[in-house]
Each structure stands twice: as structure tokens, then as C-alpha cells.
């Protein structure tokens, strides 16, 4: 967990303690957020490219949601 930022560690603790809801389809959740980020013109092009690249890599991986 040390390699992740403080905000991620905080949310992890909240989910683990039951204070924040757990999402069973974690990959679907990640892809949804990455898609929203990649499409958000308010974000920098660099951030949008990182989100698009990460999402594309997940889609090429074994993840299939049908």
C-alpha cells in the first residue's frame, strides 16, 4: 500500500472498515472512471492521455464484461 498516494490509502481504509461502500465490479468501476477522465475536456491533455492509455490496456487484457 505504501506505493499509493495518501488519498488512495484513505479510501482503502474506509472501504475496509465498512465506512465507504465496496464495488464488486472493480474493473468496471475503474474503466468507467478512466473513460470519464479521458473524455473530460477540463482535464489536461496529458492526464486524459494517461487515462485513455490505462483504460485501453485494461480492455486489451483478460477483462471482458459481457
Curated annotation (Swiss-Prot):
Gene label: yaeP
NCBIfam families the record matches: PRK04964.1
Name of this chain's protein: UPF0253 protein YaeP
Family of the protein in this entry: Belongs to the UPF0253 family.
InterPro entries on file: UPF0253
Source superkingdom: Bacteria
Pfam families on file: UPF0253 (PF06786)
Signal peptide: none
Amino acid at each position: 500500500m505504501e506505493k499509493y498516494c495518501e488519498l488512495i490509502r484513505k479510501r482503502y481504509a474506509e472501504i475496509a472498515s465498512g465506512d465507504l461502500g465496496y464495488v464488486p465490479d472493480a474493473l468496471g468501476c475503474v474503466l468507467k472512471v478512466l473513460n470519464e477522465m479521458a473524455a473530460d475536456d477540463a482535464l489536461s491533455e496529458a492526464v486524459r492521455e494517461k487515462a485513455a492509455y490505462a483504460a485501453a490496456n485494461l480492455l486489451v487484457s483478460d477483462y471482458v464484461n459481457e
